[in-house]
Amino acid sequence: MPRIMIKGGVWRNTEDEILKAAVMKYGKNQWSRIASLLHRKSAKQCKARWYEWLDPSIKKTEWSREEEEKLLHLAKLMPTQWRTIAPIIGRTAAQCLEHYEFLLDKTAQRDNEEETTDDPRKLKPGEIDPNPETKPARPDPIDMDEDELEMLSEARARLANTQGKKAKRKAREKQLEEARRLAALQKRRELRAAGIEIQKKRKKKRGVDYNAEIPFEKKPALGFYDTSEENYQALDADFRKLRQQDLDGELRSEKEGRDRKKDKQHLKRKKESDLPSAILQTSGVSEFTKKRSKLVLPAPQISDAELQEVVKVGQASEVARQTAEESGITNSASSTLLSEYNVTNNSIALRTPRTPASQDRILQEAQNLMALTNVDTPLKGGLNTPLHESDFSGVTPQRQVVQTPNTVLSTPFRTPSNGAEGLTPRSGTTPKPVTNATPGRTPLRDKLNINPEDGMADYSDPSYVKQMERESREHLRLGLLGLPAPKNDFEIVLPENAEKELEEREIDDTYIEDAADVDARKQAIRDAERVKEMKRMHKAVQKDLPRPSEVNETILRPLNVEPPLTDLQKSEELIKKEMITMLHYDLLHHPYEPSGNKKGKNVGFATNNSEHITYLEHSPYEKFSKEDLKKAQDALVQEMEVVKQGMSHGELSSEAYNQVWEECYSQVLYLPAQSRYTRANLASKKDRIESLEKRLEINRGHMTTEAKRAAKMEKKMKILLGGYQSRAMGLMKQLNDLWDQIEQAHLELRTFEELKKHEDSAIPRRLECLKEDVQRQQEREKELQQRYADLLMEKETLQAKF
């Protein structure tokens, strides 16, 4: 009988290494292929081994106290839900279950007073581990079995073969087939060029011959078509990338050599930066070294600034006392005021007060879970199972912050008196005998009683308590006597500058305004000034409209002409002169820089500044106030109304305005070569072509900008309305389905109504037929019964005769 091989058992180091290498090659989805490398393990066991032990993300360190508290708390909230508890703690489900049982067994041992140092979950001799996938690997024996050696050699060979023979053979066959096809094609072309036609032998194939026919071809209708879009430029073939080494790809030896070189550089950099760890890594000791855990200390109870303040106070008093001693002042007042506050020598060693005793939360939670597990049925009655105080306030347990008692934060320069252990008693009292007290530090003394506290009083003395009561009653009586006499007539008088005081709050000198607030206020003031200055500028500057780069002063008429100018012409000349002055001022102070131009292009503006300055010196620019500009604007509006009424002008429609604008705009032509405008009838054909090309370029730029803007808006609207659109499509589909169902239901209803009508008319006929059949059957049965009776009688008669 052949031996039956059962897969499973303890994992060995060799199997772990093979499994890790196989996962690196095949991934985490092909467990059957991975298990084929391990003769003693199944695919399910390989997957469990990876996800329970070999995965680098698994935490294998010792359980901290916080993790144990969280484990017991979550086990209480979600019992037996280890797959849910595991990601919250950061461990695997098997680790959580194993440590949970370990804590319960440990608690049971403590309850039974069995003090053993062994792990309660440790397997006894002869037991089989039910979960070998969650345990460390067993070391490999020196002399392996033949099966293990064969498995190891096979796995090494399969994992080392990154480029399999089958893939190489397929690629080679494909390349040969392609070369054969190209050779045959070249041969047919050469024969056809020589005038020899060879009919290609076609093999009868079921289906479509994709080399000779075009599948699903639809020939276009006869006629003429525009083929301008079909012209394209063929790509230049880069024959340098068609070499054999580029087609085969990178060799494995080159890749390994590059990786080794990279590892050497990494090790060299590590030696330069961290020499000890590099030495440990090269010597192989890094696997056994363990870094020390971070020292966790409680938060400090007093800051460095407070310590410096205490030191400064002590140094100041010490300097004053030494000065008084050097000057020879030894009277009682000085000695009382300048008392020595140094800590006296104490032969007893100082000890830090112990922290308050805390309860073992882990032990309490484990005892609670053990008690709940072993509880009897509630049908028996009686008292509930006694449990420790538990916490159900959240998913994770509340942590108790352990703090070292701080003796420095107590009130300085005082001496408590009511039985504080290990402290110097207050003067004038007899210290109480204290037994079994831990001596603490010698406190700071307060001979002047500057810092009295409740702890200073000796409440055990009855006379002291009575004296304090008398003093408090006397103080209260004096306070009540000092109250003013009550008055019932009140008059409310507001101060004269109450509104100003409410509007202008007093600024505290001690308050330091934040620098960000100061900068924001200054920036707001600058912005307001900039807006105010912008409002005082011309409309063309405010709207950033294009402005001429050169001023044409030839539009002015000479004054000494014959015949002399009329008043209207003189007014027009004044307007032109003011316009030229404004242009010079704007070109000097607010030169126009198109947004498309780059820095350094407008060089001509700097050269013309001297001309603008010279002109403004002869014809100074006059600034007007806001009120004057408002009056002038109102006067212009009134004059426009008068002219409109006098000339009988109505409201101009948008169509008429556009027509006039197009006519005026068509008479002006922009010359990009000269960067200026001119009349269209004065421009040459070349200038017209350049102007139209420039306009086409500008329009294309606008079109591109608007297309990008539209695409961005479309994308944004798609994001905003995509859900609504999909929802609307779904609802429309549901509505159509419901409508189809309604139509189908109506059709079925009418069908069944017709069927009912036919059935109602056919039922009486069928009933008559059935009744006739029944009657006919009854008559036939009667006849047969009568015949049967006659035959029976005849049989009896014959039997009686014979």
UniProtKB/Swiss-Prot annotation:
DNA-binding residues (ranges): 31-54, 82-104
SUPFAM superfamilies, alphabetized: Homeodomain-like (SSF46689)
Location, primary (coarse class): nucleus
Region: Interaction with PPP1R8, residue numbers: 260-606
Modified residues (Phosphoserine): 303, 358, 417
Subcellular location(s) per record: Nucleus; Nucleus speckle; Cytoplasm
Region ranges (Interaction with DAPK3): 501-659
Example GO biological process: DNA damage checkpoint signaling
Keywords recorded for this protein, A-Z: Activator, Cell cycle, Coiled coil, Cytoplasm, DNA damage, DNA repair, DNA-binding, Isopeptide bond, mRNA processing, mRNA splicing, Nucleus, Phosphoprotein, Repeat, RNA-binding, Spliceosome, Transcription, Transcription regulation, Ubl conjugation
Region (Required for interaction with CTNNBL1), start-end ranges: 200-206
Summary of subunit composition and partner proteins: Homodimer. Interacts with DAPK3. Component of the precatalytic, catalytic and postcatalytic spliceosome complexes. Part of a spliceosomal 'core' complex consisting of CDC5L, PLRG1, SPF27, CCAP1, CCAP3 and CCAP6. Interacts with PLRG1, Lodestar/TTF2, and NIPP1/PPP1R8. Component of the minor spliceosome, which splices U12-type introns. Within this complex, interacts with SCNM1. Component of the PRP19-CDC5L splicing complex composed of a core complex comprising a homotetramer of PRPF19, CDC5L, PLRG1 and BCAS2, and at least three less stably associated proteins CTNNBL1, CWC15 and HSPA8.
Protein name, per record: Cell division cycle 5-like protein
Gene designation per UniProt: Cdc5l
